[in-house]
């Protein structure tokens, strides 16, 4: 079914805003055009699905600002044969975007409700290359390591050691670093033969990366 004129206009403005804020990779823009953010926003916030702003979701979490999703995805430099680990499933929006750019996405969240709802959306949208798991994201997913790319959508005080260890040589991790009650710095980590290189990308604000499992 085609969108009504108002929704179509909002989606067009949404994509224009992404470009204005620095999302220029054609593959990333195409993926974000194909994955409708409106599918991942519910309740009172549905009419803001195409605004460039973070929005609340259940379990005290948020769906990230679209331009930040685009810039993080762009910084990850995902290739079509890559195996990607995402820490922090949340609404499932970021994993859905990544799934159009790579071979396989593993996404972990500490909240069972969020994983169940995201899995239902992935099935509804026909995205079979995403595996969503309930777990402690700070520990990564060692049984599937190493990963070509790792995306962390929650802030850690430092890049988590277990995640660095699960990054393939030649791989890239994008992670927000800093205190949870302050503005954080988004960094890109590249793993080389002799260690890790770090690039600061921009200031961001994310919910904290919490160890253990949630109550819901």
Curated annotation (Swiss-Prot):
SUPFAM superfamilies: S-adenosyl-L-methionine-dependent methyltransferases. It catalyses: [protein]-L-isoaspartate + S-adenosyl-L-methionine = [protein]-L-isoaspartate alpha-methyl ester + S-adenosyl-L-homocysteine. Pfam families: PCMT (PF01135). It is an enzyme of class 2 (transferase). Gene3D superfamilies: Vaccinia Virus protein VP39. The active site is at 64. The keyword Repressor does not apply. Keywords: Cytoplasm, Methyltransferase, S-adenosyl-L-methionine, Transferase. One of its GO terms (molecular function) is protein-L-isoaspartate (D-aspartate) O-methyltransferase activity. One of its GO terms (cellular component) is cytoplasm. It is found in: Cytoplasm. Catalyzes the methyl esterification of L-isoaspartyl residues in peptides and proteins that result from spontaneous decomposition of normal L-aspartyl and L-asparaginyl residues. It plays a role in the repair and/or degradation of damaged proteins. NCBIfam families: pimt, PRK00312.1. HAMAP family: PIMT. Belongs to the methyltransferase superfamily. L-isoaspartyl/D-aspartyl protein methyltransferase family. This is Protein-L-isoaspartate O-methyltransferase. It comes from Paracoccus denitrificans (strain Pd 1222).
């Amino acid at each position: 079914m085609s969108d009504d004129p108002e929704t179509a206009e909002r989606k067009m403005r949404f994509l224009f805003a992404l470009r204005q804020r620095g999302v220029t990779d054609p593959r990333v823009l195409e993926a974000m055009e194909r994955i409708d953010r409106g599918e991942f926003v519910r309740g009172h916030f549905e009419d803001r699905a195409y605004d460039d702003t973070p929005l609340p979701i259940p379990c005290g979490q948020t769906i990230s600002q679209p331009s930040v999703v685009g810039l993080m995805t762009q910084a990850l430099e995902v290739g079509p044969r890559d195996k990607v680990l995402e820490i922090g499933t949340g609404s499932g929006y970021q994993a859905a975007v990544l799934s159009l750019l790579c071979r396989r996405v593993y996404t972990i969240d500490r909240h069972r409700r969020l994983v169940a709802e995201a899995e239902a959306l992935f099935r509804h949208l026909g995205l079979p290359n995403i595996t969503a798991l309930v777990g402690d994201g700070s520990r990564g997913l060692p049984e599937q390591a190493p990963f070509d790319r790792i995306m962390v959508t929650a802030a850690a005080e430092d890049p988590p050691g277990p995640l660095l260890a699960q990054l393939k040589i030649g791989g890239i991790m994008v992670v927000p670093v800093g205190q949870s009650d302050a503005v954080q710095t988004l960094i890109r980590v590249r793993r080389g033969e002799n260690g890790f290189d770090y690039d600061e990308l921009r200031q961001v604000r994310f919910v904290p990366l919490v160890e253990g499992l949630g109550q819901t």
